[in-house]
A protein has these predicted regions:
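Structural helix-adjacent loops and short alpha-helical linkers that scaffold large soluble proteins
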Residues: 1-12, 58-66, 139
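A small/polar active-site loop signature that marks catalytic segments
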Residues: 1-29, 37
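Non-transmembrane alpha-helical segments in soluble domains
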Residues: 12, 16, 48-55, 71, ...
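Active-site-proximal alpha-helical segments within enzyme catalytic domains
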Residues: 38-59, 116-132
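Structured C-terminal helix/loop/strand segments within mature extracytoplasmic catalytic/sensor domains
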Residues: 107-161
Length: 161
Protein backbone atom coordinates (compact mmCIF):
# COMPACT_ATOMS: atom_id res chain seq x y z
CA UNK A 1 0.00 0.00 0.00
CA UNK A 2 1.24 3.52 -0.80
CA UNK A 3 1.01 4.89 2.74
CA UNK A 4 2.69 1.87 4.35
CA UNK A 5 -0.38 0.80 6.33
CA UNK A 6 -1.67 -2.75 5.69
CA UNK A 7 -5.04 -2.89 3.93
CA UNK A 8 -6.64 -4.64 6.90
CA UNK A 9 -5.64 -1.79 9.23
CA UNK A 10 -6.94 0.82 6.77
CA UNK A 11 -10.21 -1.07 6.50
CA UNK A 12 -10.62 -1.21 10.28
CA UNK A 13 -9.51 2.33 11.07
CA UNK A 14 -10.89 4.26 8.11
CA UNK A 15 -14.03 2.33 7.23
CA UNK A 16 -15.24 -0.17 9.79
CA UNK A 17 -14.81 2.02 12.89
CA UNK A 18 -16.67 4.88 11.18
CA UNK A 19 -19.53 2.53 10.23
CA UNK A 20 -20.31 2.04 13.94
CA UNK A 21 -21.51 -1.60 13.87
CA UNK A 22 -24.42 -2.48 16.17
CA UNK A 23 -23.05 -5.91 17.06
CA UNK A 24 -19.65 -7.31 18.00
CA UNK A 25 -17.11 -7.37 15.17
CA UNK A 26 -14.36 -9.92 14.78
CA UNK A 27 -11.29 -9.01 12.75
CA UNK A 28 -8.41 -11.44 12.65
CA UNK A 29 -5.03 -10.45 11.26
CA UNK A 30 -1.42 -11.12 12.07
CA UNK A 31 1.11 -8.45 13.12
CA UNK A 32 1.75 -7.57 9.45
CA UNK A 33 -1.96 -7.02 8.80
CA UNK A 34 -2.52 -10.21 6.81
CA UNK A 35 -6.06 -11.45 7.31
CA UNK A 36 -6.47 -14.77 9.07
CA UNK A 37 -9.44 -17.14 8.61
CA UNK A 38 -11.18 -14.77 6.21
CA UNK A 39 -10.44 -11.73 8.37
CA UNK A 40 -13.77 -10.07 9.00
CA UNK A 41 -16.75 -11.31 10.99
CA UNK A 42 -19.83 -9.04 11.00
CA UNK A 43 -23.49 -9.70 11.75
CA UNK A 44 -25.62 -9.86 8.59
CA UNK A 45 -27.36 -6.63 9.63
CA UNK A 46 -24.04 -4.78 10.07
CA UNK A 47 -22.83 -6.22 6.76
CA UNK A 48 -25.93 -4.79 5.04
CA UNK A 49 -25.53 -1.46 6.88
CA UNK A 50 -21.96 -1.22 5.59
CA UNK A 51 -23.27 -1.68 2.04
CA UNK A 52 -25.93 0.99 2.56
CA UNK A 53 -23.32 3.39 3.94
CA UNK A 54 -21.24 2.84 0.80
CA UNK A 55 -24.26 3.65 -1.40
CA UNK A 56 -25.15 6.71 0.68
CA UNK A 57 -21.55 7.94 0.57
CA UNK A 58 -21.44 7.63 -3.21
CA UNK A 59 -24.68 9.55 -3.76
CA UNK A 60 -24.09 12.26 -1.16
CA UNK A 61 -21.53 14.98 -0.72
CA UNK A 62 -21.36 14.11 2.98
CA UNK A 63 -18.99 11.15 3.15
CA UNK A 64 -17.97 11.54 6.77
CA UNK A 65 -18.31 7.82 7.52
CA UNK A 66 -16.61 6.56 4.37
CA UNK A 67 -13.34 8.04 3.08
CA UNK A 68 -13.72 9.69 -0.34
CA UNK A 69 -10.64 7.92 -1.76
CA UNK A 70 -12.15 4.53 -0.92
CA UNK A 71 -15.43 5.10 -2.78
CA UNK A 72 -13.66 6.56 -5.81
CA UNK A 73 -11.21 3.64 -5.92
CA UNK A 74 -14.07 1.13 -5.84
CA UNK A 75 -16.08 2.67 -8.68
CA UNK A 76 -13.27 3.86 -10.96
CA UNK A 77 -13.31 2.41 -14.47
CA UNK A 78 -11.41 -0.84 -14.92
CA UNK A 79 -7.66 -0.44 -14.92
CA UNK A 80 -5.24 -2.37 -17.05
CA UNK A 81 -6.21 -5.93 -17.76
CA UNK A 82 -5.69 -7.81 -14.49
CA UNK A 83 -5.95 -11.44 -13.58
CA UNK A 84 -9.32 -12.95 -14.48
CA UNK A 85 -11.52 -14.08 -11.59
CA UNK A 86 -12.81 -17.48 -12.61
CA UNK A 87 -16.58 -17.70 -12.20
CA UNK A 88 -17.25 -13.96 -12.52
CA UNK A 89 -17.82 -11.93 -15.67
CA UNK A 90 -14.80 -11.07 -17.79
CA UNK A 91 -13.41 -7.73 -16.64
CA UNK A 92 -14.19 -8.18 -12.94
CA UNK A 93 -11.22 -7.12 -10.82
CA UNK A 94 -10.18 -7.09 -7.17
CA UNK A 95 -9.93 -3.73 -5.38
CA UNK A 96 -9.24 -3.19 -1.68
CA UNK A 97 -10.69 -6.56 -0.74
CA UNK A 98 -13.79 -5.93 -2.88
CA UNK A 99 -14.44 -7.10 -6.43
CA UNK A 100 -15.43 -4.48 -9.00
CA UNK A 101 -17.83 -6.47 -11.14
CA UNK A 102 -17.64 -6.43 -14.93
CA UNK A 103 -20.08 -4.38 -16.96
CA UNK A 104 -21.06 -0.76 -17.37
CA UNK A 105 -22.82 -0.41 -14.02
CA UNK A 106 -20.89 0.68 -10.97
CA UNK A 107 -21.21 -2.58 -9.04
CA UNK A 108 -18.95 -4.08 -6.41
CA UNK A 109 -19.06 -7.12 -4.17
CA UNK A 110 -17.38 -8.16 -0.97
CA UNK A 111 -17.12 -11.95 -1.02
CA UNK A 112 -16.55 -13.58 2.32
CA UNK A 113 -15.83 -17.11 3.35
CA UNK A 114 -18.11 -19.91 2.16
CA UNK A 115 -20.40 -17.74 0.00
CA UNK A 116 -21.30 -14.90 2.35
CA UNK A 117 -21.42 -11.79 0.20
CA UNK A 118 -22.26 -8.11 0.03
CA UNK A 119 -23.39 -6.86 -3.39
CA UNK A 120 -23.63 -3.10 -3.99
CA UNK A 121 -24.98 -1.48 -7.17
CA UNK A 122 -24.24 2.23 -6.83
CA UNK A 123 -26.31 3.22 -9.89
CA UNK A 124 -29.48 1.48 -8.66
CA UNK A 125 -28.75 2.15 -4.95
CA UNK A 126 -29.17 -1.58 -4.34
CA UNK A 127 -27.57 -3.53 -1.48
CA UNK A 128 -27.83 -7.31 -1.10
CA UNK A 129 -26.24 -8.99 1.91
CA UNK A 130 -26.30 -12.78 2.03
CA UNK A 131 -25.13 -15.25 4.61
CA UNK A 132 -24.18 -18.66 3.28
CA UNK A 133 -22.32 -21.76 4.24
CA UNK A 134 -21.06 -23.27 1.03
CA UNK A 135 -18.71 -26.24 1.54
CA UNK A 136 -15.78 -24.85 -0.39
CA UNK A 137 -13.58 -21.83 -0.60
CA UNK A 138 -14.31 -19.45 -3.49
CA UNK A 139 -14.66 -22.01 -6.26
CA UNK A 140 -15.60 -20.72 -9.72
CA UNK A 141 -18.98 -22.45 -9.32
CA UNK A 142 -19.66 -20.56 -6.08
CA UNK A 143 -18.72 -17.22 -7.64
CA UNK A 144 -20.85 -17.90 -10.73
CA UNK A 145 -23.81 -18.80 -8.50
CA UNK A 146 -23.40 -15.62 -6.45
CA UNK A 147 -23.27 -13.53 -9.61
CA UNK A 148 -26.50 -15.14 -10.87
CA UNK A 149 -28.23 -14.49 -7.53
CA UNK A 150 -27.20 -10.81 -7.63
CA UNK A 151 -28.47 -10.48 -11.21
CA UNK A 152 -31.80 -12.11 -10.30
CA UNK A 153 -32.29 -9.78 -7.35
CA UNK A 154 -31.34 -6.82 -9.50
CA UNK A 155 -33.96 -7.79 -12.09
CA UNK A 156 -36.57 -8.09 -9.36
CA UNK A 157 -37.01 -11.74 -10.23
CA UNK A 158 -37.11 -14.56 -7.70
CA UNK A 159 -35.66 -17.10 -10.11
CA UNK A 160 -32.09 -17.82 -11.02
CA UNK A 161 -31.36 -19.28 -14.44
Amino acid sequence: DSNGMPLSHQFCEQLLVRAKPEHAVLWLSDAQGVELAGGLGLSLRDFARLGQQLVDARSSRNRSKIPNWFIEALVAPPALRGAEISGLGKGSERRYGFVRLAGAAQRVALIGGHGTSLYVDFDKRLVVATFASYPGAHSPAELALLEQVWKAVERGSGTVK
